[in-house]
Amino acid sequence: MEKSNGLRVILFPLPLQGCINPMIQLAKILHSRGFSITVIHTCFNAPKASSHPLFTFLEIPDGLSETEKRTNNTKLLLTLLNRNCESPFRECLSKLLQSADSETGEEKQRISCLIADSGWMFTQPIAQSLKLPILVLSVFTVSFFRCQFVLPKLRREVYLPLQDSEQEDLVQEFPPLRKKDIVRILDVETDILDPFLDKVLQMTKASSGLIFMSCEELDHDSVSQAREDFKIPIFGIGPSHSHFPATSSSLSTPDETCIPWLDKQEDKSVIYVSYGSIVTISESDLIEIAWGLRNSDQPFLLVVRVGSVRGREWIETIPEEIMEKLNEKGKIVKWAPQQDVLKHRAIGGFLTHNGWSSTVESVCEAVPMICLPFRWDQMLNARFVSDVWMVGINLEDRVERNEIEGAIRRLLVEPEGEAIRERIEHLKEKVGRSFQQNGSAYQSLQNLIDYISSF
């Protein structure tokens, strides 16, 4: 760590696994460059302060009932959090600024800025009223962050109703999306989404800058276009975990027995299956995935979160005839140490929902993907994997045993898989070069450090 520069940065993550991890990683990056770190967080899904003893953690009430905490409706959860947390956040931030102003002597630190997740709709006006610069962190790709603001309008005014003959056509405004992807991305009434997205857009444009955990090597055209769209400084500092070795900021406890089990498997023979920390699936989806794994006859590591199968506790509905075979070839756990799993020599492929963090973790470990996107940005991420980078196979919405079995065989057994592995090795090297001196992520991070220090 560099010597303290006398500056403090306040960070405010959304309390979702895919949002907390990047924010904590960013905190670690800034701390290594001499900044002191304060993390404001909700009671719900609070990050593990004990894992980061050099940071200051401040908890604010979120007003969620036990029933609301268990909801699988992310849009409802975001609405409740934004409604309930505005006043407690304002009070907490005001006290922090007052405390900093009253400090004297060597202990005095200047609060440089606030960095807030793009899903918080009230942070920009509060920061502005307190004369504190605010930067926005997006956990999406640059491409999706841009396109989410116009997709509702495109769906309503341009692409609906969609003819069967148009399903595979590219969305001209946002390739590589297909027209049929828009319907899956916007699977709720667009009138409900419009006010939320409009607030996010206006808050972002009024902020002092925008941070992405991506780099120009992965999304060059969109980075350039985003600078034109938002007219604010944009920093693509690269996949966050590439700056530091993994440390646990997971909200779930990983099953560490995965690693010794993987140690017993042959190189690049195991298919790793995980659909992230938010996605829920039906009982029939789980059974189709189980049959696909069984019929592929390849060793596998399957993650099934408790409560992730709608209406069920865990995997109790998988038929005994399948479980017997599954137990012979694979291992089923409730949560896995994903970064450690992906870098293991035994992993030959990743059947993933294509959340952005999972996607770039797979790229950075050169693990080819089988894409099974379910919602929101995952469809666009999967298109990048299969159609742009060509480092995976896209199942789209086909949760069918034959499709899953075939994709596993194509990836791990057939010649097609070897070509995909070569391409993802090249992509890994390309992304890796972005972190070297004068690389895009390296330079963007340095620009971010200088920018924050200038406030």
UniProtKB/Swiss-Prot annotation:
What keywords are annotated for this sequence in UniProt? Glycosyltransferase, Transferase
**Any keyword Flavoprotein?**
no
> Under which main EC class is this enzyme filed?
transferase
Among Gene3D superfamilies, the record links this protein to: Glycogen Phosphorylase B
Q: What is its EC number?
A: 2.4.1.-
- List the GO terms this entry assigns under cellular component, sorted alphabetically: cytosol
| Superkingdom of the source species | Eukaryota
- Listed GO molecular functions? nicotinate-N-glucosyltransferase activity
Which InterPro entries did the record assign? UDP_glucos_trans (IPR002213)
Binding of UDP-alpha-D-glucose: at which residues?
277, 336-338, 353-361, 375-378
Q: Does the keyword Nucleus apply?
A: no
Quote the Pfam families the UniProt record gives.
UDPGT (PF00201)
Which family does the entry's similarity section mention? Belongs to the UDP-glycosyltransferase family.
Q: Which PANTHER family match?
A: GLUCOSYL/GLUCURONOSYL TRANSFERASES, UDP-GLYCOSYLTRANSFERASE 76C3-RELATED
Protein name as catalogued: UDP-glycosyltransferase 76C5
Q: Which organism is it from?
A: Arabidopsis thaliana (Mouse-ear cress)
